[in-house]
């Protein structure tokens, strides 16, 4: 405990007047009264329900066990309610002790006034004339010191007594068996084991009896025949589906084989075609070379390339085409066969038409010359008509 007598009145008075007061203690006492009232009501209701069940339709060992488990809980609620009520009363005692100590404590302004008066007396005590007044002031201050200390000691003693009267609260007792779940699990496991053992003991004689009887067959032909009867109606559609799949597979294989054969033929044809094209190209080159050589020799023998003359500003005409002078002279040697026909219309037509298919080109020497180019001229000339029907004069 704090030695309040060693503390000056300024400290004790300041602590008492600066605190929250007794209002918090009074509020706490009211709350404890409410808790006590609720516990008393709960205990009374619980007790009435238990007695109503056990004295009515529920009678037996289970009812007795329920009463034995519920009675401690009812007693605990009643005891706890009494403790809460006692706590409320003791809190009120502490609040009353505070109020008493507060009333006995010297107010801080009085103590401050006493100290201020002492300072004035000491300051004006030049010749010692204030000595008696200073002594009286110090005596009053001592009385204040003693009064505050007594008030604090009394408040502390009363609060300690009220606290010591309180009893510690206990936890609520268990109204169920904590090992009940474990015992239930053990009982269930034992029941399962017992049932399995009983079933095993019942099956052993039956198995021995079956072994004692002669076995008919190791294969269950009856069951297999029933199974075959159930499956056989479904085998025909399955076989049809399998046949269809086989047909599709065969068709696919045929197509693959045809494609493979075509691929092989193409692989064999490609080199042969390439060889044929290469051979034809070589033959064409050789033919053109031979034709060029023959043409050159014919031109050389006929003298076409021997002399070249040029005349500035003048050219011969073959029809509407301007040609060199040599071409015009050569063109006169070509005489169309149509001019020898006895018909006048044909003759006039032959005179107005060009001499031959090449439109007056200078091929006279080429056709009349006996050189090696005559074969080419004969090849380019149209074959003679086997028969020409004469025009009848009566037809106009």
UniProtKB/Swiss-Prot annotation:
SUPFAM superfamilies named in the record: PE/PPE dimer-like
What this protein is called in its record is Uncharacterized PPE family protein PPE19
> Gene of origin?
PPE19
Concerning PANTHER family, the annotation shows: GLUTAMINE-RICH PROTEIN 2 (PTHR46766:SF1)
Q: What GO biological process term is on the record, naming one?
A: response to host immune response
**What InterPro entries does the database record attribute to this sequence?**
PPE_C (IPR022171), PPE_dom (IPR000030), PPE_sf (IPR038332)
Q: One GO CC term of this entry?
A: peptidoglycan-based cell wall
Q: Which family is this protein grouped under?
A: Belongs to the mycobacterial PPE family.
